[in-house]
Amino acid sequence: MEYTPSPKPQLSSRANAFSIAALMSSGTPKDKETQESTIKPLEQFVEKSSCSQPLGDISIVDSHGEFTNSPSSLCTEPLIPTTPVIPSEEMAKISCSLETKELWDKFHDLGTEMIITKSGRRMFPTIRVSFSGVDADAKYIVLMDIVPVDNKRYRYAYHRSSWLVAGKADPPLPARLYVHPDSPFTGEQLLKQMVSFEKVKLTNNELDQHGHIILNSMHKYQPRVHIIKKKDHTASLLNLKSEEFRTFIFQETVFTAVTAYQNQLITKLKIDSNPFAKGFRDSSRLTDIERESVESLIQKHSYARSPIRTYGDEDVLGEDGQTMQSRGSAFTTSENLSLSSWVSSTSGFSGFQHPQSLTALGTSTASLATPIPHPIQGTLPPYSRLGMPITPSALASSMQGSGPTFPSFHMPRYHHYFQQGPYAAIQGLRHSSAVMTPFV
């Protein structure tokens, strides 16, 4: 019996359209990426730009603060009025140069990144500029603002070690001008000194009330420096349309705002270049909470940076400006005499005795010849007011006089931890079995 194959079932037009043969035959090569989806370096930043009006041939400033004419595709709402487009003859004579340009060039070659936090973070490198061509008898106001480079959001590709476009930019944040706190400057001052914006802080907190510059993370920004000639009748900067000003842009100061460094080379360069970042060489192993805690401790407690600390009961000023007594601790007697003040009164350094410790010194009548073992084994010896260790003989005398008794638990010396750097400090505090006592 001869076998005859059954005819293939006929597919509907809809099913046939999704068949393998149809899909393979109808496939078309993908269009190449357009120039708008690629990252372009910042060519020029416009002095006059607006999102609501088309851009034409407008006057802009190059990296040396000189005006040139070139079109730009940037779309940014200007913070400073753009009239007059061409500066006056007097303002045209002013030139501005970027200090530490070599350092900025190193960061620019790698792709500068700036950390932004809720509380605000200072910039490094710092924008420092110097002016020439100003009138020595006139007064000038120096400002800075930071504007977006484009309308794109970026992401860092670790496998390519480069920044890629991740999509459209987030909605623009409130634009702010930072007026240099030393303004207004006289022309003579500007000729003799440079202007440093070291106190500028960057934040991602949209509700910031401290005057910090608000930025979006993973967006590229361009700082701009403005100089305004202050007129005699000008009382404030509320109306800048009638003022004479000039804007300076430096291409090497373009940066990407981030909440954590993406490029490890940027991290290394900042640590090597920033003298205040030496202690954070191993900070990458710290958690965010630990890093913020260490930074706040270093800022608030000055003795963490110095081996010498005054341990008196001096009055301190509270937040409301009223005088308040410093808080006590586990090492405070019933007469409100702290352990450190009592020890310093019996240490033999009469020139540094606390006034309240004179009564304790007068009641100490024991002999100084018989030393006793240290009362707290395995811990640091007591320190006097200047951080000097107390001798066993002086300690023996103080133990038999009128003063507090030593507790039986460990006494952590936080300032010794912090001398080793923030990472060593947090490791010492993390692995220590000591009873944590408050700072006094």
Curated annotation (Swiss-Prot):
GO terms for molecular function: DNA-binding transcription factor activity; RNA polymerase II cis-regulatory region sequence-specific DNA binding. Gene3D superfamilies: Transcription factor, T-box. It comes from the Eukaryota. Residues 103-282 bind DNA. Keywords: Developmental protein, DNA-binding, Nucleus, Transcription, Transcription regulation. GO terms for biological process: heart development; positive regulation of DNA-templated transcription. InterPro entries: p53-like_TF_DNA-bd_sf (IPR008967), T-box_DNA-bd (IPR046360), T-box_sf (IPR036960), TF_T-box (IPR001699), TF_T-box_CS (IPR018186). Disulfide bonds: none annotated. SUPFAM superfamilies: p53-like transcription factors. Coiled coil: none annotated. Signal peptide: none annotated. GO terms for cellular component: nucleus. It is found in: Nucleus. SMART domains: TBOX. Transcriptional regulator that may be involved in heart developmental processes. This is T-box transcription factor TBX20. It comes from Xenopus tropicalis.
